[in-house]
From Swiss-Prot:
<protein>
    <recommendedName>
        <fullName>tRNA (guanine-N(1)-)-methyltransferase</fullName>
        <ecNumber>2.1.1.228</ecNumber>
    </recommendedName>
</protein>
<keyword id="KW-0949">S-adenosyl-L-methionine</keyword>
<comment type="function">
    <text>Specifically methylates guanosine-37 in various tRNAs.</text>
</comment>
<dbReference type="InterPro" id="IPR016009">
    <property type="entry name" value="tRNA_MeTrfase_TRMD/TRM10"/>
</dbReference>
<dbReference type="GO" id="GO:0005829">
    <property type="term" value="C:cytosol"/>
</dbReference>
<keyword id="KW-0489">Methyltransferase</keyword>
<dbReference type="InterPro" id="IPR029026">
    <property type="entry name" value="tRNA_m1G_MTases_N"/>
</dbReference>
<keyword id="KW-0963">Cytoplasm</keyword>
<comment type="subunit">
    <text>Homodimer.</text>
</comment>
<dbReference type="Pfam" id="PF01746">
    <property type="entry name" value="tRNA_m1G_MT"/>
</dbReference>
<comment type="similarity">
    <text>Belongs to the RNA methyltransferase TrmD family.</text>
</comment>
<dbReference type="GO" id="GO:0002939">
    <property type="term" value="P:tRNA N1-guanine methylation"/>
</dbReference>
<dbReference type="InterPro" id="IPR002649">
    <property type="entry name" value="tRNA_m1G_MeTrfase_TrmD"/>
</dbReference>
<dbReference type="GO" id="GO:0052906">
    <property type="term" value="F:tRNA (guanine(37)-N1)-methyltransferase activity"/>
</dbReference>
<feature type="binding site">
    <location>
        <position position="117"/>
    </location>
    <ligand>
        <name>S-adenosyl-L-methionine</name>
    </ligand>
</feature>
<keyword id="KW-0819">tRNA processing</keyword>
<dbReference type="InterPro" id="IPR023148">
    <property type="entry name" value="tRNA_m1G_MeTrfase_C_sf"/>
</dbReference>
Length: 241
């Protein structure tokens, strides 16, 4: 694994639509960090690695069927042009679900090379030949991998050193503790007949922490049984040590 260049996370995005970047990554926390050089983003136009007069990047699927498939030779040349040992990721709905654990691991590394699929998908041979890690951001279909790449990078960049103003904020958010977040409130004290829970204005920080944990556990148990089961299993494991 290469070390971070100048201590910066380096993202290379391979796409047919480089004009989509930085997009939302150019504003707010990610945009400020990009402008300050806390991370690096570059794009690679996949079509630049196509050959022939028409510079075709796709072809009809072997065996028939609808749509087109991105060509292995073209994609491989694009990947090889930036291969320096960083993880190679393919954004695809058939990939492993993106988790906060994987996001944090990426943030701790030197960066990532991200391939944005289009059409029906990418020739399986280049996925195998270049050992691409297939990642999904959810069980739904997008027009291409660019939006998914932006989601992944936004999640990663906010964890980089110096990006978030309050480190504790990142450590107490949903998924970092294995739970969904507790409810949040701020002034005014009462709004449309709904008051901020008294415990949050009591000044008793121990009681506040306990209330927040109980609320996070309740919300996780009700909304994400899968996360709740994993959380309980982890607690039993820790308790048994």
């Amino acid at each position: 694994m290469p070390e971070k260049e100048g201590g910066r996370f380096h993202a290379s995005v391979l796409t047919l639509y480089p004009e989509m970047f930085p997009g939302p990554l150019g504003i707010s926390l990610a945009g400020k960090a990009l402008a300050e050089g806390k991370w690096q983003l570059d794009t690679v136009q996949i079509r630049d690695f196509a050959e022939g007069r028409h510079r075709m990047v796709d072809d009809t699927p072997s065996g028939g069927g609808a749509g087109m498939v991105m060509k292995a030779d073209v994609v491989a040349r694009a990947l090889d042009s930036v291969d320096d040992g960083r993880p190679m990721l393919l954004m695809t709905p058939r990939g492993k679900p993106l988790t906060q654990e994987r996001v944090r691991a990426l943030a701790d590394g030197a960066g990532a090379i991200i391939l944005c699929g289009r059409f029906e998908g990418v020739d399986e041979r280049v996925i195998e030949g270049r050992n691409l890690e297939e990642i999904s951001i959810g069980d739904y279909i997008l027009s291409g991998g660019e939006t998914a790449a932006i989601v992944l990078l936004d999640a990663v960049v906010r964890l980089l050193p110096g990006v978030m103003g309050n480190r504790e904020s990142g450590e107490t958010e949903s998924f970092e503790t294995g739970l969904l977040e507790h409810p949040h409130y701020t002034r005014p004290q009462e709004w449309e007949g709904r008051a901020i829970p008294d415990i949050l204005t009591s000044g008793n920080h121990g009681a506040i922490d306990k209330w927040r944990l109980e609320q996070a556990e309740r919300i996780t148990r009700e909304r994400r049984p899968d996360l709740w089961e994993a959380y309980c299993k982890n607690r039993r494991k820790i308790g048994g040590q």
